[in-house]
Amino acid sequence: MVVPGTLVTEPGNTPLGPSEPSSAQEKAQPPKAYDMLRMDGERIITEEEHFGIINGLLTAGINYRDVGTLSGLYAPPYASSDFNLELRLFGEKVTTKKYDWRPIEVRREGELHGIAVSTSTLLTLGMRGGILAVTLRNATDKKQDVPVQLGISGTFDNVKYWGFPRPDTTKNKTIIVVGQGRIIHYNSAGAFVVSSDFNNLVWEEASEWSSHWVTTVVMRPGERRTHYIAFTLGPREEAESLCDRLLKDPSDVIQRSIEASTRKNEDLSAKLPVFEASDSRLSAYYTRSLQHLMLNKWTVPEFVLNPYYSTGSIKGGCVGCYLWDYASVPELMPLYDPTAAREHIKQFLRVDITKHFLFNPIDGQGDGPTYLVNQEKIIGCIYYYVLHTGDVKFLEESVNGKSVLEWVIHQATHGDDLSRPAVLVDYGENVSHLELRHQYKYNHILPDVNGGRYASYVRAARLAALAGKEPTHLVARPEPLKELLKKTLWDPQGKWLGFQSDKGELELRYSNIIFTLFGTGVLDQEMELGLLSHVNEKEFLSDYGLHSISKLDPAYDQVDIDHGGGGSYVAFPGMIAECLYKAGYPDHAENILKRTLWWAERLPYWGDSIVANQIDYRKDTPLQCAMDAAAGAQCVIFGICGIRAETSGEITVNPHPPKFSPNISLKGVNIRGAHFDVIANRNDYEVRVGSKTLRSKVGTPVVIAASA
């Protein structure tokens, strides 16, 4: 039997040689579902600076190049940004030969001077703490005295604001208290505590920056033993008490955490459909994309919402909740966590989204300037929540003196005057929309934002009708906007929608954000075909993805990955592919999507932006685990599998199996009270609803009757 810190190739063996029983951890046998999201380190391109694990209360950085270093602990509201725990044998770090990743655990293996070392760093579920299990095996035929050092350092703070950057606690020094097998770093904000069961630990303090425990482990030939190091943070008494609990029976704690993590994986699969494809890359892409809902879910008592879904998570990056990002998966959230979807919508309505783009989870206050898409985003969240749950009464709930429906109408008409003829809104010099670098602009009368107003009016009118209100004033607005958009901003020669600058001139900026207008109804056929003519390898496509700006645009900047050229904001390939599926262009959709399947093979989680012409990702950002990376899975359900909830309560199914993966299935769909499976190939498909099976040819939709 093997310990959690061992990578197993065959029962009872490790890649470094035969294993021996470890009585301290015999219970800790990981269930199969625990490995659902596992990834081998040899495939991972994520750099150490961005590499970590999370348990919903705590996220920790793992230095995978050696077997025993941790860097940075973030357990909102507490943090130690420069926390460092470093294991050395014979005075040096043990180089990692093999490692793997799971959401709450990293396992590493190495060998030094005949001592095989395997470690497991695991965050304990439901706690602001974790365990580093260290297994040593003397692989020689001689007795060995193994010098062990544990370096421990760091500052600490109770952080009141969690926005875009990682918190920086380095100005908040700590007082160090050393006890038997325990070290406490504390100040007025709280503490982090490290405890270990290594025998005869002696604290050697060289300076405030260089201190470590030392001991010597005497090992007989072939002997194998496991020791544990627990780490916790929070209020001092709580952190000390938790450390004691973790070391009292570490194997039991590890087993319970593995089981709890397994249940979280199973919960993800139970609440959202299970997708399988003949091309296993597509199946893996779907599952890896879905996990971002789980990885960005916090259960922090101090947060204004619990559970709370952050924009980012790993290593404390971008823990604030941005409306842009949260609302990029509006169709998924009501299926996965409908109660949280309601609460997040209401929290955004409490914040003035005409002035702010995020709210701080500690106090719920808005921060930052506005984003121009905020109105379209919040309406989309409300629209899909009502459609996918059937909870029409939500529109009657009051938030800050207005009903949810009144907020929908308020946001849809923002910047407009319904008593006057329709106009395209001039958004001024706002540069936050695409955040382009250098001298290149994209401002004033913008095609994508004005085009998005069309969809907002359509959705607002439908919601009003569902609530029994007369939506005449809303219904009358979309068509004039559509006409104005084409008349004012369409360039038939460039086959593109331009923006009108402050000089009144039409300028072209070939941004992929325009493609998000597909499927909304605001584009006519001439515009759709014109825009699609640019989806080629000279302009927007490369071998490994979609570019945010055409490679022929003078504003193209290789290093500006998210919106400036070199790649794309992580949600956009999935979002755009879904829009194209909905608009009736499946070939173009799959041509984009298939280029991004490598993400699931090389990145354990997906950050802000991914490069399109290399296997690489954006590194100059703390947002390395983005919630809206789940847009890929959203595309699979609502694009490839063609699931659509109608305002009538009916569910339409119209799948589009891709050429590169002709056989697909989506099982366990649960939307608006309807439960069904979809099994399809390139010719025909069937929808199984209870004991009934509905069959059809691909291209001919099946309609499931509204639930009672």
Regions found by a protein language model. Name each.
Residues 2-281, 582-585, 643-708:
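Terminal accessory carbohydrate-recognition/targeting modules of carbohydrate-active enzymes
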Residues 446-471, 475-478, 482-485, 567-603:
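Extended amphipathic alpha-helical segments enriched in small hydrophobics
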